[in-house]
Every structure is written in structure tokens, then in C-alpha cells.
Design a protein with these regions (language model features):
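Signature of dsDNA virion morphogenesis modules
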Residues: 1-128
């Protein structure tokens, strides 16, 4: 049970909401995404997966099995999975060995994507 998906896409405005429900946008350059991906790996976060950014809702037996930064859009391993992504995109393969999570959240479409934990990104701002 594998999920193949972009983790972060560069040079796009991404809508978010703050704690008061106010809308704002975040934006990441290719270089920033590369720094985030490397820091994520260096911090050994590959198996620290939670549900909906809830640190009290860690998901066992789900991990990033593989990830990379797209270098050539038309000649990238992500093409095999049906993607044509911008240079600088962080792409990943998530292995889901948790049958219950796969059945209840992935297969039902309740979980539609991945997001790098905000806390992790906030810590990273000190590195950039």
C-alpha cells in the first residue's frame, strides 16, 4: 500500500487559515523546499506521521519510504506515477502498513493529501 504524491510544490501560493480563521498564503521557493526536505530527513522524521496535524493522533506503521526533489520535469521518476511536476517539487512515496488507516482514511478519500507539519516548518525558519 503505497501513496505516491507531491509533498511540496515550489513557487505557488498555498492558502492557509490562522487560528482565528483568517486566510493567508504561504509560498516556498525551490531552494527553501530543498532545505526543508533535507532538514526533514536529517531530523529523522520519516516515520513521524500524524493525522490532520494533531500531535496526539500519531499514525503507526506509515512512513516516508522514499523522497526526492524533482530535477527535470519531463524525466523524473514521478512521471511513472502519472505526474508531470515543476522542477524543485519535493515528491515522496509513503508506505502504509496500517490496514485500518488505509481502509478508513486513504481508500475512503477522507485523506486527500499530505502536508509537512507546521511546527517543523516553523523550526526551519531559524535555519533559513
Amino acid at each position: 500500500q503505497i501513496i505516491a504524491t507531491p509533498i511540496m510544490v515550489p513557487n505557488k501560493l498555498i492558502p492557509r487559515r490562522d487560528e482565528n480563521g483568517e486566510k493567508y498564503y504561504v509560498y516556498f521557493t525551490e531552494e527553501t523546499i530543498k532545505k526543508i526536505a533535507y532538514a526533514f530527513a536529517q531530523s529523522k522524521n520519516n516515520d513521524k506521521i500524524n493525522h490532520e496535524h494533531d500531535m496526539d493522533s500519531m499514525v503507526d506503521d506509515v512512513y516516508v519510504a522514499e523522497s526526492w526533489i524533482v530535477d527535470e520535469s519531463n524525466n523524473d521518476k514521478s512521471n511513472v506515477y502519472g505526474y508531470s511536476l515543476d522542477k524543485g517539487t519535493w515528491f515522496g512515496l509513503f508506505k502504509v502498513d496500517n490496514d485500518e488507516y488505509w481502509r478508513d482514511f486513504i481508500k475512503t478519500g477522507k485523506v486527500k493529501g499530505v502536508s509537512v507539519e507546521g511546527y517543523f516548518i516553523n523550526k526551519l525558519t531559524k535555519l533559513i
